[in-house]
Design a protein with these regions (language model features):
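N-terminal leader/targeting pre-sequences
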Residues: 1-165
Length: 165
C-alpha cells in the first residue's frame, strides 16, 4: 500500500498561510465562518468551517451553497447586491466556467453547519491574498455562464495573510 503524502491532521494543527473570516449579510447575520489556506507541494489545502447557514427541516431539501473565491478586495456593496465589490469569480486565466481558479466545491449544509477540507491546484496561496471568499444562497450549477447561477451572495470575507495566528 502506498503511503499518504499529505497529512491533513498535521497541517490543520499548524498556522495557515492565509485565512478569511466570513460574515453573513444583513439578511443572514448569523452566518460566521473561517476558511484557512495551507500551501503544500501538491497544491493548496483549503479547510472551511461555517455556522449559521440557512436550513430547512425537510430531509429532502438540505441546502447546498455555492462557494467561491472572488476577484474583489472587499466585502462592501449596495442595496441590490450586499457584497457587490467582491466582484466576479477569481479567474486570472479567463477560463470559461466552471474552470475559474476561484470555482470551489460546494458547501453542504448540515443543520446550519458546514465543514470541508479539500486540495486544489488552481491557485497558490500568495495569489489569493487580498481576494474575497463568498458563500452563495444556491449551489453552483457548474454550467451557466459566467458564474454558475449560484444566487445571492450571503456571506463574505477577505483572504488575509497569516503571519501570526
Amino acid at each position: 500500500m502506498q503511503e499518504c503524502r499529505i497529512n491533513p491532521k498535521a497541517l490543520l494543527g499548524q498556522c495557515p498561510q492565509a485565512k478569511a473570516l466570513l460574515q453573513g449579510s444583513a439578511k443572514y447575520p448569523d452566518i460566521k465562518g473561517k476558511v484557512m489556506f495551507y500551501q503544500t507541494e501538491y497544491g493548496v489545502m483549503v479547510a472551511a468551517e461555517v455556522m449559521g447557514l440557512p436550513f430547512r427541516m425537510n430531509q429532502c431539501d438540505r441546502p447546498v451553497f455555492g462557494f467561491h473565491i472572488h476577484e474583489g478586495e472587499c466585502c462592501l456593496g449596495n442595496a441590490e447586491d450586499t457584497f457587490a465589490e467582491a466582484g466576479q469569480h477569481y479567474n486570472p486565466e479567463e477560463y470559461p466556467h466552471p474552470y475559474h481558479a476561484g470555482d470551489l466545491p460546494p458547501l453542504f449544509g448540515n443543520s446550519g453547519y458546514a465543514l470541508q477540507v479539500f486540495l486544489t491546484e488552481r491557485f497558490c496561496v500568495r495569489e489569493i491574498v487580498g481576494r474575497t471568499m463568498i458563500i452563495h444562497s444556491m449551489p453552483d450549477d457548474f454550467t451557466s455562464q459566467p458564474s454558475g447561477n449560484a444566487g445571492e451572495k450571503i456571506a463574505c470575507g477577505v483572504i488575509k495573510s497569516c503571519c501570526n495566528c
